Amino acid sequence: MSVKEDRNVYDVTIIGGGPTGMFAAFYGGLRQMKVKIIESLPQLGGQLAALYPEKYIYDVAGFPKVRAQELVNQLKEQMDLFSPTVCLNESVDTLEKQEDGTFKLVTNQQIHYSKTVIITAGNGAFQPRRLEIESASRYEGKNLHYFINDLGQFSGKRVLVCGGGDSAVDWSLMLEPIAQSVTIVHRRDKFRAHEHSVEQLKKSSVQVKTPFVPVELVGDEHAIRQVILEHVKEGTKETIDVDAVIVNYGFISSLGPIKNWGLDIEKNAIKVNSRMETNIPGVYAAGDICTYDGKIKLIACGFGEAPIAISSAKTYIDPTARMQPAHSTSLF
């Protein structure tokens, strides 16, 4: 199968579409750069959108509290002022500097070219731990969910949540007011979630099934209709009627191919200097993926690092450009 090739050479290509990457895309536009952003997930927003879109964040400057998905929506509106090219469902496999100084990025879908690269991949590419039942994959994209983007789709439905951590318990509690019924199944007697959340769960109408594991999905070509649960200790089985199944077994994250790009890596993070420069000229890193003395992993810090990385990339491309940009109030 031939791989598509985008021969356009961008000023900057951002690897990772989480909040830091999205703000970097906006800032690249602000500095009149041609920007592309590549994200491995089906949507922008990184872990905010994939793991806890309905949760509130309390440590973003200027927001006493902001729902995670709302922050993502605002970031998208902001970056769309400059219409960056967005590539979703693409994982970058190789990054290679060519003889002319430009970078060649090969993903699972196509080949890209860029004058500079900014890596904002958070904790690396992450994929959900999947339900290990033979027929599970055929229901992905139907009524078996690993990501939740819209709580409303579960309104009036019988929902089974699998898992015992914070995500499983939090989703169960958030679904309780809108779903017809919510059942949570966990293979252990005790939940790993925050104590306060577990207490709320006990007081709620959520049906708790412990220690059980799902062992079989019963359905047709359209959807799962029933889930068979097995008691971990006794081996007895129960059948539950469902309209939707949500699996929260956590995520597997790793730097993956990034480790093979010749970058200086320290404790699973990319080493950068005060200009967000890596050891490869023209390649920068920002957000949780990077490390330096005094590094703090916060969204707020990533928002500060993104403009530094962009401005460094700008001056790399054009040495006559100013590192210090003009204030945004004078640009619109």
Curated annotation (Swiss-Prot):
Superkingdom classification of source: Bacteria
InterPro entries found in the cross-reference section: FAD/NAD-bd_sf, FAD/NAD-binding_dom, Fd--NADP_Rdtase_type_2, Ferredoxin-NADP_redctase_2
Cofactor(s), names only, from the UniProt record: FAD
Gene3D superfamilies reported for this sequence: FAD/NAD(P)-binding domain
Keywords: FAD, Flavoprotein, NADP, Oxidoreductase
Pfam families per record: Pyr_redox_2
A molecular function GO annotation: flavin adenine dinucleotide binding
Cofactor note: Binds 1 FAD per subunit.
Catalytic activity: 2 reduced [2Fe-2S]-[ferredoxin] + NADP(+) + H(+) = 2 oxidized [2Fe-2S]-[ferredoxin] + NADPH
Top EC class of this enzyme: oxidoreductase
Amino-acid positions noted as binding FAD in the UniProt annotation, renumbered to this chain: 20, 39, 47, 52, 92, 126, 288, 329
Assigned EC number: 1.18.1.2
Similarity section: Belongs to the ferredoxin--NADP reductase type 2 family.
Subunit structure: Homodimer.
Designated name of the protein: Ferredoxin--NADP reductase
Species the sequence originates in: Geobacillus kaustophilus (strain HTA426)
